[in-house]
Amino acid sequence: MKAFDRPALTVLLVQGARDLSLNLSEAQITKLIDYLALMAKWNSVYNLTAVRDPVQMVTQHLLDSLAAVSAFSNAKNVLDVGAGGGLPGIVLAIWAAEAHPEMRISMIDTVHKKTAFLTQVKAELNLSNVSVYTARVEQWQAPQKFDVITSRAFADLSDFVNWSEHLLADGGQYIALKGVAPDTEVAGLPAGWQVREVRALQVPTLQAERHLVFIERTVL
């Protein structure tokens, strides 16, 4: 792994946030870099991400997730399915702690080493708006239903919906983070579900396509 140059990474993050028109506080910037440092440290043993270069991690992890956060502005209870190393859930939690302090983010993954990492991040960064669960989402009975369920690089859209629809509140929506526009996946959605919007995202310094897919129940 390349050296973790905190000042340089901070400059890159601050500029990227500015390009996204996000007004992040100094405390939020510090927590995001702290999170990245934890990921880089744990990644050598736990293989949380294939991205090893901290500069690329700022772009492909932090800015990639930050580009999506405004879509969650009206959410109260969010579930991040297949949370992995914490994307977008941890980034969303750091942003929401100041921007939307009423928001709560639950994160679920089947892999214990990943939820152990998320639990450590929650503790070290004092993220009181985060809950972490180790379970299969299709078998999980949550303490409450969620108005937004999200995922990043988790599964085909049809599987994503089928496995977690019992957890979505009435009137809730899915927000899936995808690369290229998933036209084939959209066409394969199960009956009773519709795509409300596919929104292209521009991620600073990333030369790749990113899209948000908004899915909701079909109104009869």
UniProtKB/Swiss-Prot annotation:
NCBIfam families: rsmG_gidB. Specifically methylates the N7 position of guanine in position 527 of 16S rRNA. The lineage of its organism: Bacteria, Pseudomonadati, Pseudomonadota, Betaproteobacteria, Burkholderiales. It catalyses: guanosine(527) in 16S rRNA + S-adenosyl-L-methionine = N(7)-methylguanosine(527) in 16S rRNA + S-adenosyl-L-homocysteine. This is Ribosomal RNA small subunit methyltransferase G. Its EC number is 2.1.1.170. One of its GO terms (cellular component) is cytosol. It is found in: Cytoplasm. Belongs to the methyltransferase superfamily. RNA methyltransferase RsmG family. S-adenosyl-L-methionine binds at G82, L87, V137, E138, R152. Coiled coil: none annotated. Keywords: Cytoplasm, Methyltransferase, rRNA processing, S-adenosyl-L-methionine, Transferase. GO terms for molecular function: rRNA (guanine-N7-)-methyltransferase activity. PANTHER family: S-ADENOSYL-L-METHIONINE-DEPENDENT METHYLTRANSFERASES SUPERFAMILY PROTEIN. Its main location: cytoplasm. InterPro entries: rRNA_ssu_MeTfrase_G, SAM-dependent_MTases_sf. It is an enzyme of class 2 (transferase).
